[in-house]
Curated annotation (Swiss-Prot):
Record-level Gene Ontology MF annotations: flavin adenine dinucleotide binding; oxidoreductase activity, acting on the CH-NH group of donors; tRNA (5-methylaminomethyl-2-thiouridylate)(34)-methyltransferase activity
GO biological process assignments: methylation; tRNA wobble base modification
GO cellular component: cytoplasm
Cysteine disulfide partners in this protein: none
Keyword Cytoplasm appears in the UniProt entry: yes
Entry protein name: tRNA 5-methylaminomethyl-2-thiouridine biosynthesis bifunctional protein MnmC
Spans through the membrane: none
Amino acid sequence: MPAVSRPLPPLTALAPPELEWRADDISDAPYASAYGDVYFSRHDGRAETGHVFVEGNRLPERFAAWRETRAFVIGETGFGTGLNMLCAWACFERHAPAEARLHLVSTEKYPLPRDALARALAIWPDMAARAGVLLDQWPEPVGGVHRLWLSSRVVLDLHFGDAAERLSRLDGRVDAWFLDGFSPAKNPDMWQPELFAAMAQVSRPGATFATFTCAGVVKRGLRDAGFTWRKTPGFGRKREMLCGEIAAPPDDRRRASTPWFTPPRARPARHVVVIGAGLAGTSVAAALARRGVAVTLLERDAPGAGASGNRQGALYVKLAAETNPQSRVYLAGLLYTRRWLTALDPEQRLWQDCGVLQLAPGDKEATRQQRFLAHHALPERVLHGVDAATASQAAGTPLDAPGLDYPQAGWVRPDRLCQQLAASPGITQRRGEAHDLDFDADADAWRIALTDGSTLTADHVVVATAHEAPRFTPLAGLPLKPIRGQLTHVPVPADAPSLARVVCAGGYVAPAMEGVLSLGATFAPGDTDTAVRTTDHARNLDEFTATLPAFAEALRAAGVTLDPAACEGRASLRAASPDKSPYAGPVPVREAWLDDYAVLGADARRVPSTAGRHHPGLWVSAAHGSRGLASAPLCAEVIASRLCDEPLPLERELIDHLHPGRRLIADIIRGNATRGNATLSTSSPNDDAQPSPTTTETP
């Protein structure tokens, strides 16, 4: 039967290592007390890295000869101080062609605190520039994948957690391995058969490895996993080390228990058309252009004209009390978006990391938040609970309710962000509306028919048109529901009281920007009218005054008019999936899935071996709902990474959770799937078939 997902652990901060600082031949160096071992050679750690890992994998010659369009991928067990990865980066820049790209993947169970990392890397002043880039993006110690762009050509994916477990969930293939970590005698838990099997599973044919140790457990583990090894001279006092390769690793693409999620094989990506220039589309376009792909961005209006055209949007997420895939995706997305925005706009012209307070004004939400805090233990810099007094101090106004504080979250200008992304080098903007898509098998290309009669051709097409995606024939049946949301804009004078945080409850209010206070937003599933309504302004203002009564009264005292008839605003449509998670990935061939997996409707235990069939080069990013600022940039990386044959920025099961075919396979199993172009019902058993009455929802 379809695989049962492994239980997801709580969202917690990883423990830091127990460190001592001991003098060596160069300076004071970190020493792992729990393992009784050093992080790098006391004599010359950088020289050891060069000898063992860089030369052991023949990186200078391989980089110099690299001509493939995909990135060269290095995998590492044990990031430690990052010395190995920084040396690989330096070697790549010295030897690789200008158009080559490098992708680094490293695991770490006990991430160093940032100040300890800085102290360790300060031993080598000539590495300060690269170390500074790493330190500026150093992630919080949260288990999972953290993607860092070290340069325009170099990406680092940090997988925080146990090495074997993290590699078993890696979605990607590796060209060269740095098999590092504390010695097998002092850290036997890492050097287990599961580690070597996971390495083999995600190795490309001919992948190499190098390691400092010749321990028997390592030689046996490598051999049993399919690697061949040989002894070569070691570094310094170590007489020998191991190098080797794996000629024929297993096919990592195929999902044995969920074959429908088998990723499509890579195809050339000379030209990609992205349809839709909201945040989903512009994020994908920019991610592809960053990788050197020629992109045409097709939009019937200006970039950011739809639901992404709001003046301000809250950058935060609402995490479930119990761990689920959706919460893990959104948490990873929130952390990625913050790093991404920091690199994109360090002056914060497009965003502010002022923090977000998610209040609990009623017993139900207060109970839910208490359950969350009891189950999870994230770093305080990411999320922590606050009482009403602490929340009041953080917000800069009296509050009556406790809540959750996201100190690194904030607000973003989605309209300006879309415009900046659309103007990225490598993107050609095209004004027009796509009528339909058709794959020309003879030309091995997509033809995009425009309403003006013209046609575009492309190797790949990414559809990012929110609830309108199913109007394209290959996406007919993709369950998406339009949701109307209206924001209210209240003019405020420069000397009016101000908020220090975005405050969310039933609705939200952001700190005033350019003399306007933005609050909302209404939530009306199934309503597609975008005309601004005074009644919705009234609803937003009622929610605002109920959530922030003292602040509302202070505004009135300052002469601010809170009259719905005098307010301006904006209404737009966002899209949601039935399970409230985004779609990001390849588009399944619906009729093929109905045929290939029909047996599941009679017996879910009879899983066919047939790999899922997808439309070649067709992708979708949609259903970002009211959390698109946290999900769209990371989903763009998911699509760009898969399209460019790179390791993905999420665990394998979370990639599958985002798959656009997840509802289709669920309906096949339940016997609810339909043939033809009929759109699946987007209602859950408890949903009303008619458009819901307007309510308010935090963005």
